[in-house]
Curated annotation (Swiss-Prot):
Cofactor(s) the protein requires to work: K(+)
Gene this protein is translated from: mnmE
NCBIfam families documented for this protein: mnmE_trmE_thdF, PRK05291.1-3, small_GTP
PANTHER family attached to this UniProt entry: TRNA MODIFICATION GTPASE GTPBP3 (PTHR42714), TRNA MODIFICATION GTPASE GTPBP3, MITOCHONDRIAL (PTHR42714:SF2)
Protein's recorded name: tRNA modification GTPase MnmE
Class of this enzyme: hydrolase
Length: 435
């Protein structure tokens, strides 16, 4: 297998650039460039010299012999000065060694998986950790890399395999006196309890999707109620056009924010009203769809001239807020909050309420749940097979056992214990080249 190398420290130029290598030629490459093989897992400082004798850089080198490395192969890292010319010259030198080439995206992690250093859940968690932009996403990724999910899924799979063993024993030795016909009957309660655990885990994963995908907060209201001013103040910059003319916003505008360490997608929509303008009508239909899909709807009213807006059916929480508080006296309308998006009067209170809403929703989520849609889908497939086995007790026992086998295979595919070769290219292509 080729020895692979890549920059693993990010964009250049930088203070330091880390070049990672993995494969059977690492010892030869390191010895040639350093003039010696450094002590394992100790930083070695010295000059790096090309094979033609030219100076490359003064650098730190660390050697990780197999199997005690990230990939399970011989690995090394060169910590160079992070100039583009320095790094490019060093990469060119590495490419001159026989059997050495630039790594493909995710190839280091893929080799770690193939060598049993990572399972698929941990690999996906690692990819999520690299991509994490908020504290909640970081915690979600750490859950995947910790191995706790893997332990849970393997435990469930082991239970299914043990149950199948009882059933198959009855099938294979039904005429033996020491194998009673009621053995398999005793396990179906265990199967039902396992199915309940899986369903609860799936429901937790669907609730927790907001940690990865973000909260969807939609701003709606009548034209000229100040929706775009609210959008701009929340975004901290002008992203929406604000004028006295009604109907300025024709399409939905989206801004990504972080509130309380949680990802939030804020959407400003076209004002709801009767209109003959075809473009504006389309904008209003788009707004209604966003309301249906929202986690929170902020229904904005002009406090001097509050116009009622009729929203489509939605499962989202709806906040009625009064805007333009700087122009009008506090009134008795049932506003949740009153503020001025233009001047910022009482807007801090509104921001704190938004943050509290997000944190409250997160507090309802448990500590262990599927972190990715792939995992969630395979869990649903496993539940479907278990339900087929439990609910159709008139089926031949061998068919019911087959449904349980398929369920355990779906659980095995989550961790990669069952052949998932067709998925590996998709999963590891999400990584950067140096990971």
């Amino acid at each position: 297998m080729d020895t692979i190398f890549a920059v693993s420290s990010g964009l250049l130029p930088s203070g330091v650039a880390v070049i990672r290598l993995s494969g059977s030629h690492v010892v030869h490459v390191v010895t040639t460039l350093c003039g010696c093989l450094p002590k394992a897992r100790f930083m070695h400082y010295g000059n790096l010299t090309a094979r033609d004798g030219s100076f490359l850089d003064s650098a730190l080198t660390v050697f990780f012999p197999a199997p005690h490395s990230f990939t399970g192969e011989d690995c090394a890292e060169f910590h160079l000065h992070g100039g583009k010319a320095v790094v490019n010259r060093f990469l060119d030198e590495l490419s001159t060694f026989k059997g050495c080439r630039i790594a493909e995206p995710g190839e280091f992690s893929r080799r770690a998986f193939m060598e049993g250093k990572l399972d698929l859940v941990q690999a996906e968690g690692l990819a999520d950790l690299i991509e994490a932009e908020t504290e909640s996403q970081r915690r979600l990724a750490v859950m995947g890399t910790s191995g706790r999910l893997t332990t849970l899924y393997r435990d469930w799979r082991h239970k299914l395999m043990k149950i199948r063993a009882f059933i198959e024993a009855e099938l294979d030795f039904s005429d033996e006196a020491d194998i009673p016909n009621t053995v398999s009957d005793k396990v179906w309660k265990d199967v039902e309890n396992l199915c309940i655990s899986l369903r609860e885990h799936i429901a937790e994963g669907e609730r927790a999707s907001i940690l990865r995908d973000g909260f969807k907060i939609v701003i709606v209201g009548a034209p000229n109620s100040g929706k775009s001013s609210i959008m701009n103040r929340l975004a901290g910059k002008p992203v929406a056009i604000v004028t006295e003319e009604a109907g300025t916003t024709r399409d939905a505008l989206e801004v990504r924010l972080v509130l309380g360490g949680l990802p939030v997608f804020l959407i400003d929509t076209a004002g709801f009203r009767e209109t003959d303008n075809k473009i504006e009508q389309l904008g209003i239909e788009v707004a209604k769809q966003h309301v249906r899909d929202a986690d929170l709807v902020i229904l904005v009213y002009d406090m001097q001239n509050p116009k009622e807006v009729y929203l489509p059916e939605t499962s989202a929480e709806i906040w009625r807020v009064g805007n333009k508080f700087d122009l009008y006296e506090e009134n008795k309308e049932p506003w949740l909050i009153q503020f001025s998006a233009l001047t910022g009067l009482n807007f801090d209170h509104f921001m704190k309420e938004l943050e509290s809403f997000c944190l409250r929703r997160v507090s309802e989520i448990g500590n262990l749940f599927p972190a990715r849609k792939r995992q969630l889908q395979l869990l649903k497939e496993a539940v479907k097979e278990i339900e087929n086995s439990v609910n159709y007790d008139s089926l031949d026992l061998s068919l019911r056992a087959e449904h349980l086998r398929r369920a355990s295979d779906f659980l095995g595919k989550i961790t990669g214990d069952i052949d998932v070769e067709d998925l590996l290219d998709i999963i590891f292509s999400e990584f950067c080249i140096g990971k």
